[in-house]
């Protein structure tokens, strides 16, 4: 069962799947809030390698948001008005635990 559209099977190698680069991204996504850290880690594990450049750009912009906003959006307490962020939030929340 696929949980996000970015898990599509492709014959191409992802452009950024080198362990060092992925580790830097994991470090950048750390928030010190267990819920957020878990959601970001699941996205990076399940979707990042196959994500398009546009999807990656949205994720990188998403990381620049304030932690309290990220938490409210991802926990469903507040609706994000940015359509690209809203799509990412749906994807992240649908990933398996």
From Swiss-Prot:
Cellular component per GO, a single term: cytoplasm
UniProt keyword annotation of Cytoplasm present: yes
InterPro entries xref list: SDH, SDH_sf, SdhE_FAD_assembly_factor
Localisation per UniProt entry: Cytoplasm
Gene3D superfamilies: Flavinator of succinate dehydrogenase
Keywords carried by this UniProt record: Chaperone, Cytoplasm
Main location: cytoplasm
GO biological process: succinate metabolic process
SUPFAM superfamilies in the record: YgfY-like
Transmembrane segments annotated in the record for this chain: none
Cystine pairings recorded for this chain: none
Family the entry assigns: Belongs to the SdhE FAD assembly factor family.
Function: An FAD assembly protein, which accelerates covalent attachment of the cofactor into other proteins. Plays an essential role in the assembly of succinate dehydrogenase (SDH, respiratory complex II), an enzyme complex that is a component of both the tricarboxylic acid cycle and the electron transport chain, and which couples the oxidation of succinate to fumarate with the reduction of ubiquinone (coenzyme Q) to ubiquinol. Required for flavinylation (covalent attachment of FAD) of the flavoprotein subunit SdhA of SDH and other flavinylated proteins as well.
Protein name: FAD assembly factor SdhE
Organism listed in the record: Xylella fastidiosa (strain Temecula1 / ATCC 700964)
């Amino acid at each position: 069962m696929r949980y996000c559209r970015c898990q599509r099977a492709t014959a191409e190698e992802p452009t950024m799947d080198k362990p060092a680069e992925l580790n830097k991204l994991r470090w950048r996504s750390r928030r010190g809030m267990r819920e957020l850290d878990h959601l970001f880690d699941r996205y990076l594990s399940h979707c990042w390698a196959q994500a398009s450049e546009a999807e990656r750009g949205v994720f990188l912009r998403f990381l620049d948001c304030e932690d309290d906003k990220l938490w409210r959006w991802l926990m469903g307490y507040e609706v994000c008005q940015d359509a690209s962020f809203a799509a990412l939030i749906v994807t992240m929340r649908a990933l398996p635990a």
